[in-house]
Design a protein with these regions (language model features):
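Conserved N-terminal beta1-alpha1 strand-loop-helix module at the mouth
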Residues: 1-70, 75-76, 80-86, 167
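Short beta-strand/loop segments at the ligand-binding rim of alpha/beta enzyme cores
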Residues: 1-4, 61-69, 117-130, 179-188
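Glycine-enriched alpha-helix->loop->beta-strand junction motifs that scaffold or abut catalytic
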Residues: 36-38, 62-64, 83-89, 123, ...
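Glycine-rich phosphate-binding active-site loops on the catalytic face of alpha/beta enzymes
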Residues: 43, 91-98, 149-161, 206-225
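N-terminal active-site wall of soluble small-molecule enzyme domains
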Residues: 44-119, 137-138, 152, 172-176
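C-terminal helical cap(s) of enzyme catalytic domains, especially alpha/beta-barrels
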Residues: 60, 103, 164-165, 219-237
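Catalytic cores of alpha/beta
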Residues: 75-84, 135-145, 188, 192-207
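Histidine/lysine/aspartate-rich catalytic loop segments that bind and position anionic ligands
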Residues: 127-179
């Protein structure tokens, strides 16, 4: 079964908007696990506009499922993740000024750089996933870089799905199939929600993990976080 990793960045954004520690990010992560989530995802950025470095350390001590830390592999980021050693690091080529991640790596162009980063993380026994666009060439070069997994950027899928679900699925089939054929683990994330998640998993049942944050928090405003997580888990069965 595909695992659900809950991205809690939005919870940290809410906390930081008011100061103090409400909501408690670490408590929220633990509760997500209690409600069935099989992982917690965070994406600390240099300006700490949501997740802070201290959060990552606390989460490492408290999370009992899988901790996935996303980020651009700067020296500062690599120092953080090699210190805490999360279950998985997802390499994302985002600029510090970006509101959210909006493209994957050009793994062919940056092959040598990514190889070096992957080797560094593997030395600490950290599973490495590389965030890529749905392009089979990018998937192949992620494998050449030594990645354990790729995470397919599903922003375009979500956008297409609203207009033409079949077209959205077919646009991702070459990349998803390539990952499966190569024996490369495949994650997916960005703009997945209660409407578009199940068709994606039905089309690509070898998806190892989905990372979902924004939609889960939006749904939780109406359903509550416990029921929301159950709704997503039901779609992944």
């Amino acid at each position: 079964m595909t695992k659900l990793s809950v991205n809690i960045n939005k919870v940290a954004t809410l906390r930081n908007a008011r100061g103090g520690n409400m909501p408690d990010v670490e408590r929220f992560a633990v509760d997500c696990e209690l409600f069935g989530a099989q992982g917690i995802t965070v994406h600390p950025r240099p300006d700490e506009r949501h997740i802070r470095k201290e959060d990552v350390y606390q989460l490492k001590a408290m999370v009992t499922t899988e901790l996935n830390v996303e980020g651009n592999p700067t020296d500062e980021f690599l120092a953080l993740v090699t210190d805490i050693r999360p279950t998985q690091v997802t390499l994302v080529p985002d600029d510090p000024s970006q509101l959210t991640s909006n493209h994957g790596w050009d793994t062919r162009r940056h092959l040598d750089f990514l190889k070096g980063v992957v080797n560094q993380l593997h030395a600490y026994r950290i599973r490495v996933s590389i965030f890529v666009d749905p392009d089979p060439v990018m998937v192949e070069y992620a494998l050449r870089a030594g990645a354990d997994r790729v995470e397919l950027y599903t922003g375009p899928y979500a956008e297409m799905f609203a207009e033409n679900p079949k077209k959205a699925i077919e646009a991702y089939r070459p990349a998803a199939t390539k990952a499966h054929e190569l024996g490369l683990g495949m994650n997916a994330g960005h703009d997945l929600n209660l409407k578009n998640l199940k068709p994606f998993i039905q089309a690509f049942p070898w998806t190892a993990e989905v990372s979902i944050g924004h939609a889960i928090i939006c749904d939780a405003l109406y359903l509550g976080i416990q029921e929301t997580i159950q709704e997503y888990l039901n779609l992944l069965k």
